[in-house]
Amino acid sequence: MKLLGWMHRKLRSNNDVFKEFNTGGGGACNCITGLASPDHDNDYFSGDDAAHASPPVTAGDLFTFGGSGLLTIGTLGIAAVAIPSGGDDDDYDIDFEVDATSDDDGGFTVEDDDADVGGAVTPTFTFPAATAAEAVVATVEKAVAAVEAIAEKDDDTTTEDDLMVVSAELEKVLGGVDVASARVSFAMGGGVDCPLQGFLFGSPVSDVESRPEYLQAPRDSSGSCGGGGRRTSLGELFMRTRFADEKVALVAVAEGEDGVAGDDGAAAAGVGGDRAGKGGGYKTMKKRKVKDEKGGGGAAGGGMPATVTKSKFQKILQIFHRKVYPENTLLTRNLTKKSRNRGATDNGGGAVATGDPDGPLASPVLRCRKDHPMRGFGCCTNGAFGASSPGGNAEMNGNKSGHWIKTDADYLVLEL
């Protein structure tokens, strides 16, 4: 409103048309007369008016021009705007004094002085007391205290009720509240195989009927597992579970390796001599010895030698790699079979394989490698060797074994 009054005041003091309407001398016909405004009416060029403040603006100056019926917006109106009379004409700025008070109950209330103006009710904002949050905090504190009390107990004094309480708290933490109650705790079922439960609870319940007999550690007089009251570590529990789950796979792998080794040893002994037969028999004997010690050592409860432990670790590592990288394992098996078959085909007849001087000579590749100790710098590196070689070695020299690139033509062929 103050800005609007200032704009109209400037408009009236600088425009001659409004001056003619206010004096009533010319009416509408004097709109085109260009009269020079005196210096005291021009606020832009008068030094006295610029030095002093402007006179106060009344409500009549804001809405009407001398009772002529003209609106202040600049358009011609039919009726003049009704102006309120009284002491409220000088000020139209309304200020509400708002008092913000805080209740004793923790609520926040907004009040104003003119609460009964127009029959309106003063809005009151009151925040409810934090009773629900306090109840939740109290419940959590009770649960934490109960779990701590159970954790301080010994393994012998732990009961099924304590285990159920801890299991319920774990379900809440892990987000199992929304799951149906059909899930049975391991303490009630007694057959769930989960090594993490045994590590968390540290009680004999985790070792009961969860593993085979040959994997269970002997108990002492107090009833705890592991001998001497030692708590079973998490790594041992996971290793026991892994042995129980992959026992069939380990036996199958061991039997497969024993069968292959036995066949290779027998074939080499019949063809090559005592050295090959000794190697195959030693390998088979070693595998069977490891297998027997693995089967009897766990049941007896005695310590296993370092070689058996290392062999078990290697087998577990192989199974892990087969599960993680199945395509690499399959490729390795195929390459091993191909190399085995190729070696049997090349060494099936000849003086090198059988030791018979009357038999045909070995392949040119073997003779070439025997004559030239440094591989890659003999007749094998010649590009024309494949053409002059016999038909039996054409596949090896052409596709499966490469040759050195000596000319640009060879490089161009390889690039294409």
Swiss-Prot record:
Phenotype upon loss of function: Tiller-spreading phenotype due to defective shoot and tiller gravitropism. Extremely larger leaf angle at reproductive stage. Altered endogenous auxin distribution in shoots.
Motif (IGT motif): 69-75
Assigned GO CC terms: nucleus; plasma membrane
Principal cellular location given in the protein's record: membrane
Signal sequence region: none
Motif, Nuclear localization signal: chain positions: 278-295
Transmembrane segments: 63-83
Stretches the record annotates as Disordered: 266-306, 337-361
Disulfide bond residue pairs: none
Gene Ontology biological process terms in this record: gravitropism; regulation of auxin polar transport
Location of the protein in the cell: Cell membrane; Nucleus
Membrane topology (UniProt): Single-pass membrane protein
Keywords: Cell membrane, Growth regulation, Membrane, Nucleus, Transmembrane, Transmembrane helix
Residue stretches of biased makeup (Gly residues): 270-282
Expressing tissues: Expressed specifically in the cells at the inner side of the vascular bundles of young leaf sheaths and peripheral cylinders of vascular bundles in the unelongated stems. Expressed in the leaf sheath pulvinus and the lamina joint.
Task performed by this protein: Involved in the regulation of shoot gravitropism and tiller angle through negative regulation of basipetal polar auxin transport (PAT). Acts as positive regulator of lateral auxin transport. Promotes vertical shoot growth. LAZY1 and TAC1 play opposite functions in the regulation of tiller growth angle.
Family statement drawn from the similarity comment of this UniProt entry: Belongs to the LAZY family.
Designated name of the protein: Protein LAZY 1
